[in-house]
Structure formats: C-alpha cells, structure tokens
UniProtKB/Swiss-Prot annotation:
Protein function: Appears to be involved in vesicular protein trafficking, mainly in the early secretory pathway. In COPI vesicle-mediated retrograde transport involved in the coatomer recruitment to membranes of the early secretory pathway. Increases coatomer-dependent activity of ARFGAP2. Thought to play a crucial role in the specific retention of p24 complexes in cis-Golgi membranes; specifically contributes to the coupled localization of TMED2 and TMED10 in the cis-Golgi network.
Glycosylated residues, chain numbering: 125
Organism, scientific name: Mus musculus
Required for interaction with STX17: region residues: 121-160
Assembly notes: Monomer and homodimer in endoplasmic reticulum. Predominantly monomeric and to lesser extent homodimeric in endoplasmic reticulum-Golgi intermediate compartment and cis-Golgi network. Probably oligomerizes with other members of the EMP24/GP25L family such as TMED2, TMED7 and TMED10. Interacts with TMED5. Interacts (via C-terminus) with COPG1; the interaction involves dimeric TMED9. Interacts with PTPN2 and SPAST. Interacts with STX17; the interaction is direct.
Lineage, top ranks: Eukaryota, Metazoa, Chordata, Craniata, Vertebrata
Cytoplasmic side: 223-235
Chief location category: endoplasmic reticulum
GO CC aspect terms: endoplasmic reticulum membrane; endoplasmic reticulum-Golgi intermediate compartment membrane; Golgi membrane; synaptic vesicle
The protein, known as: Transmembrane emp24 domain-containing protein 9
Domain of life: Eukaryota
Motif (COPI vesicle coat-binding): 228-235
Protein encoded by which gene: Tmed9
C-alpha cells in the first residue's frame, strides 16, 4: 500500500552494516511513508484487496470515499448515500479482525495483534449497483498506520495540552513506533533465518537420500550382472 514498502534493517556487524543512527534515520523515513493515499476502480461484483505489512499492537485508520461516473457530464461525481462499501480485514493468520458494512463515504479502524501482512479488502453492496447500470465505481482510499493515525489536534484539545506537551507526546509515540518497527524487522529476520535453515536441512537430507539411492542402484546392478554372468557360465 505504501509508496515505500519498508527499509530492511539487519543486525550489527562492523564494516558491513548500518550504524544505529543510520538505522534509526532510515526507520524514520520508512515511518514517514506509512501513510498511503490512492484511488482505484471496481466493478459490480469485484473485490479489491491490498496487503499492508504492520507490526503488532499498531493502530490503522482507513478513510475512503466513492464516486460514480456521470455519463452526461463525463466525469466522476460523489456517490449516492445508498451505495455502501463493505470492508474486511484479515491478519497474517487469515483470521478476520474487521468485517463491516459502511456507507458511500466512511472511516474504518482496527488494531493489529499479530505482526505481518494484513489483507484489506473492499467491495460494494451489489444490490445498489443498479444505480449506475454496470459502470465503474471509483474509490479513494487513504490509510494511516501507527503514529500517523493519531489526530493530534483532537488529542491536544481533549487533554488540554500545550504546544510543547503535544510535541513531547508526538516524539514519545514516534519512538514507540520505531521500537515496534525494529521488533518487527527482527521478527522478519528470525522467520527468514528459520526458513533458510529449514530449506538447507531439507536440501541436505535430499542429497543424502539421492546418494543412498545411487549406492543401492549400484549394488543392485553389480549383483544383477554377477548373476547374469554366472548364469551364462562366464565366471
């Protein structure tokens, strides 16, 4: 979803890997790109799904609005209120964590509990699609992840925070989000390491099995040839 999918940060080895300061800087750049806005078109029975990599315990907010194509004006116009949008979100274990019907314009929110790839799917309620007779529906979607999902103007008004207090709170939440992203990167590296070790082990056992098969075939051929020569009284 995001314009920048992420910065891969690995462990520390002198001369080969980035220092802590540079890694933190790259993570800040990555966090800055966590908000992603786009638009897409869907047909009457079509479902659009997007994959977003999200750390655990991270809030995600999605805002969307729909438009119908006006053939007379030859342009997209805001959709009628009767045209709804169904939003479904699944976690990396394929469990549904959000499934709800919204209006033609709305906002959905969820919090991740498992790190990894989350699937966000949207499709319209087909019973209302007769309103535009098989045309295309344009959906504008804006997704904010983590600290970017917070409305700090609302937080400042609600908690009566000064500008300095609000800034400190923003910095604290940014640091917390960076820690979550670092933990997520370590989790991904651990999974990759486990997958690599499992693959290497399978390759090793397959090589051993191939060797045993070749040895067994060689022994069988030797015994078969010996029996053949004995039957022909050549030995």
């Amino acid at each position: 979803m995001a314009a920048v999918r992420g910065v891969r940060v690995v462990g520390s080895s002198p001369g080969l890997l980035l220092g802590r300061g540079m890694r933190a800087f790259l993570l800040l750049l990555w966090l800055a790109a966590r908000g992603s806005a786009l638009y897409f078109h869907i047909g009457e029975t079509e479902k659009k799904c997007f994959i977003e990599e999200i750390p655990d315990e991270t809030m995600v907010i999605g805002n969307y609005r729909t438009q119908l194509y006006d053939k007379q004006r030859e342009e997209y116009q805001p959709a009628t209120p009767g045209l709804g949008m169904f939003v479904e979100v699944k976690d990396p274990e394929d469990k549904v964590i959000l499934a709800r019907q919204y209006g033609s314009e709305g906002r959905f929110t969820f919090t991740s509990h498992t790190p990894g790839e989350h699937q966000i799917c949207l499709h319209s309620n087909s019973t209302k699609f007769s309103l535009f007779a098989g045309g295309m529906l344009r959906v504008h979607l804006d997704i904010q992840v983590g600290e970017h999902a917070n409305d700090y103007a609302e937080i400042a008004a609600k908690d009566k925070l000064s500008e300095l207090q609000l800034r400190v709170r923003q910095l604290v939440e940014q640091v917390e989000q960076i820690q979550k992203e670092q933990n997520y990167q370590r989790w991904r590296e651990e999974r990759f390491r486990q997958t690599s070790e499992s693959t290497n082990q399978r390759v090793l056992w397959w090589s051993i099995l191939q060797t045993l098969i070749l040895v067994a075939i060689g022994v069988w051929q030797m015994r078969h040839l010996k029996s053949f020569f004995e039957a022909k009284k050549l030995v």
